[in-house]
């Protein structure tokens, strides 16, 4: 991309930190609690060499194992040779299951002024721009734009002036601001791996999550406002399943390559393919992740006889010759064969 991606002055790319984080499991009430520095530790405090595990034409993988407060961290890094992405598997092992301890994976970015976005259902949210104005109300008084950490979907992304970074994630919650003392002013993508909590009920139990925990992440860079953000962030969490030397049916007629349904517009995402509730038609639900009207064509394994625009509960609205989605639209179509 021609621009630096990581700023490793304070944290290394992909290192794990742990902090104390006192809070409840069901509701944080006015604001989500923030961690503090009691018992702070990070994997770079216990530096060990990375060892080459595999080396081939597709990727080279490296592995390291090191202690951290109350656990052991094992990380596997895969650097791909033909495609621009790095995979990281993180295993949190021998966890002592203590209360009020939090672990985060740190990706410090070399972006002084960046916009942070993440996947939400049927779209993406940009921090400080797309939240509902004000606070949620009732007992919640903190402005929505200032609440963090955030619940995320498949990915978390940050865009600088010249390039962007997207991190696919297997966790539900992430942060983007340095939570430690003397915080830095650049963005740090932080999937939260584990946080032990106590029930908000006065007689409730502790949620200490005993056992080993495993996570998977993928990192890539791309141009700002590129559709690769959604494509990479989602596809990395939905890998292809390989079938080796399958038994062939005697009357097999399908070609070696065939797609059940595909679309020709990278800004349109298919979220559901299912049988219609009322008949044997096929239902396809999709959304437009761009801020302009988009036209999309479905390529199917059998030519459809009719495409019908429906509402969300699959009631027919009108037959269409072409599928056009308005900006950020979520639409449902019935396919008849």
Where are these regions (language model features)?
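C-terminal (or distal) subdomains of carbohydrate-active enzymes
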Residues: 1-337
